[in-house]
Amino acid sequence: MPTISQLVRKPREVSIIKSKSPALENCPQRRGVCTRVYTTTPKKPNSALRKVAKVRLTNGYEVISYIGGEGHNLQEHSVVLVRGGRVKDLPGVRYHIVRGSLDLQGVKDRKQARSKYGAKRPKKA
């Protein structure tokens, strides 16, 4: 335990919490324009073609963000909404694109977890 005079000389250091999504600048989401839409392969134990997009945000940042769900209608110059949240098996992907918002449509024929994929409630037969 330090003495009071030691604490007066050198106060306790407050640990700085580093943001996991710095490009959002403490906002819940950010709008951006797709500069490139492509697929990439995940890290070692997994194997797939993951859909990602390089997005230029309104604050000038350029980030790589993940497009969740089956199938999408994104292309270059599409306007999208970007939220935080990384993809564990894709290095450098620290953001997600919000489905069913702006230019990105929701997942077609989605029955469960619809709100996460911007899918409307199916019509009763």
Curated annotation (Swiss-Prot):
One of its GO terms (biological process) is translation. PANTHER family: 30S RIBOSOMAL PROTEIN S12 FAMILY MEMBER (PTHR11652). The keyword Nucleotide-binding does not apply. This is Small ribosomal subunit protein uS12. HAMAP family: Ribosomal_uS12_B (MF_00403_B). Pfam families: Ribosom_S12_S23. With S4 and S5 plays an important role in translational accuracy. Interacts with and stabilizes bases of the 16S rRNA that are involved in tRNA selection in the A site and with the mRNA backbone. Located at the interface of the 30S and 50S subunits, it traverses the body of the 30S subunit contacting proteins on the other side and probably holding the rRNA structure together. The combined cluster of proteins S8, S12 and S17 appears to hold together the shoulder and platform of the 30S subunit. Keywords: Methylation, Ribonucleoprotein, Ribosomal protein, RNA-binding, rRNA-binding, tRNA-binding. InterPro entries: NA-bd_OB-fold (IPR012340), Ribosomal_uS12 (IPR006032), Ribosomal_uS12_bac (IPR005679). The gene is rpsL. The modification 3-methylthioaspartic acid is found at D89.
